[in-house]
Amino acid sequence: MRNTSILCLTLAVLHTAAPAQAEEGSGPAAQAFDLADLTQLTLARVEYDSVGGMGEAYYAFEGRIWARWETDFPQAEHNLAKRLGELTRLTLVPDPARRRFTAPDLGDYPLLFMSDPGYMRYTTEEAESLRAYLQNGGFLWVDDFWGDAEWASFERFMREVLPNNHWREVPIDHPIFHTVFEFEEMPQIPARSFASRGGFTAEPAWFHRYPAGDLSRATMRGYFDSDGRLMAIGTHNTDIFDGWEREAYGSWYFERFSTQSYRMGVNVLTYVLTH
């Protein structure tokens, strides 16, 4: 394991500081990064295709049409980069990249973000490219998909990516839950539209692909290689990225949801860069 001293945080800062809230608004090997020079590190969002029409492959929100892949993009990554720059010794490029799995430079990014894959459509070439990326040291974080049907869509893709591998729930004693911040459970972050100051945090089943099943419990599900390295995670029944994107929604939202989202982001990024 590489020296993690550069990743140490002043933990009390994130816990107690009043936030200066942001405005809303055959694959290559993953590159080895020098933790002492992370100005080269850019967050990358996966661009992918989806099946269906309005409400499936794309949706209307806040006066525009969104493709599924761009949910929370680019504000989530921009805010995460900004916060990491303020609260840690990490320096990230503020503007995230967008890449398809078949991009020739995919290995330049040690961590890929992917959002809302509940209606995902993929090609064999994309599956093969992601397989090579993961087997060569890359890491995939998939977020914001709720219920059984949306998970099944992503799992079908991963069966082609890693045909001899099966997901399993990442236990709470795994290092990813403890690299910097301590978690006793996977936090459940609802989309801003369903967030409240108290009470339930699960999103409603009617808002998601049928059959949704039970959405009450958030989990982290992972794919591990033969040596036990965690290669990919799906944060299921939660929307961590929205906690970054919507931090300006209000101080109560920041305290209840964004703080937990940023803590999880710090833990995941720390884990990826040190394993």
Question: What spans do the regions from the language model cover?
Answer:
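An acidic, glycine-rich "communication" segment
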Residues: 51-59, 150-241, 245-246, 257, ...
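Extracytoplasmic/secreted proteins, especially bacterial periplasmic and envelope-associated proteins
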Residues: 75-79, 83, 125, 129, ...
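N-terminal secretory signal peptides that target proteins for export/translocation
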Residues: 1-2
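Bacterial N-terminal signal peptides
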Residues: 5-16
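Surface-exposed patches in mature extracellular/periplasmic domains of secreted proteins
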Residues: 90-100, 142-146, 165-173
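Aromatic-Pro/Gly-enriched surface loop or interdomain linker
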Residues: 22-111, 117-118, 239-240, 244-275
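Short alpha-beta junction capping motif
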Residues: 43, 111-151
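Loop/turn elements at helix/coil->beta-strand transitions in domains of secreted/extracellular proteins
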Residues: 39-41, 107-112, 136-139, 165-166, ...
